[in-house]
Amino acid sequence: HVAQIELGLLLAQQKQGEEAVQLAMQALAGAPKDSQVMVGAINVAHLSGQSDQAVAWAEDGVRRFPEVAGIRLFLARLLVALDRPKDAQAHYEVVHSRVPGHEETLRGLLSCAVRTGDNDKAAHWADELLALKPNDALVQYWHALTHGQMPTTQPPEVVTSIFDDYATNFDLHLVRGLKYQTPKLIADALLARFPDRKFNLLDLGCGTGLVGVYLGRIDGHIIGVDLSEKMIEQAARHGIYSRFHRVNVLDALRETPADHYEAISCADVLVYVGDLAPVIPNALRVLKPGGHFIFSCETAGEDEADLVLRPSQRYAHKASSVERQLREAGFDDVVIEHLPVLRMENNQPLPGFLAVARKPLTA
């Protein structure tokens, strides 16, 4: 039966989900009292993209093997992924009552409390986690947030965890589901400024390479930077990028020599970076004279703070503040294009803006 599960896992990874789940069913029928087979079957269904089946087996597993914490944790993770945090929380609480101080359980409880908007509970779990992991940047971030402080940037782990999970379906999810046009708008803005296609581009937070896809071939190099290895793997398949660096946006800018690129693009990335103070001056330094920095932001209202952390855990920026920062850093010819629909969020249009800033030809 274990062999059936192993084969099922292999088939699931090869995108043969139906056959994989059938094998898992056979294994479960043949070994109904084996908790390891149950865990394997749940994993097969999960890897096959059959979430409902995975949850059904996990719920059955919790009934059959109530003492096996691993099955209950697996169920809780599945429920969180299906946006059922209240249901997940109940299972995390059971595990916590039996095994206090378990890191994954505490992280799960914190996540559920944040998702359900229960800030008192979130602060409590963040306190427990910080006592357990005092040097963990992600824990420090959530602890600050749940205690009423707004961190001015997010630790890289926040972004990596989001986008590694997203990678294979990212283009489809964004372009079709969220009416996401930013990479095309950035590509159009670049081609309007470089009609001969002669430029080198640093694409910060390149994701699956949509800016490159919309640009097509250029007479120069496109260098992609992203924290998510899985995103980079997807982007590489287009055959448009010259090379990639797996590093965060701030480090990429800091480590790039001065006067190096004709253009820098940044599509839907600064919403995760937050504070632009370390971004804008370095972008100016890295650009060649006459080069362009093109990026998108979610809009914070003019009656709001310059930087606002939304419940989505993305930062919104005030357009007038961004324009001021660009000009103060030394950019000229700054254009802000307001976009009524940057993307869709919970079936509602989310406003944003595209900023295009040129480095002066002479210092």
Predicted regions and their residues:
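N-terminal auxiliary segments of SAM/dcSAM-dependent transferases
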Residues: 108-160
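A short glycine-rich, Lys/Arg-flanked "PGG" loop and its adjoining helix->strand segment in the class I
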Residues: 277-289
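Short, glycine-/aromatic-enriched active-site segment of Class I SAM-dependent methyltransferases
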Residues: 295-314
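Canonical tetratricopeptide repeat
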Residues: 6, 40, 74, 108-109, ...
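Class I SAM-dependent methyltransferase SAM/SAH-binding core
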Residues: 202, 208-253
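Short alpha-helix
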Residues: 314-330
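A short acidic, Gly/Pro-enriched loop at the edge of an enzyme's catalytic core
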Residues: 254-264
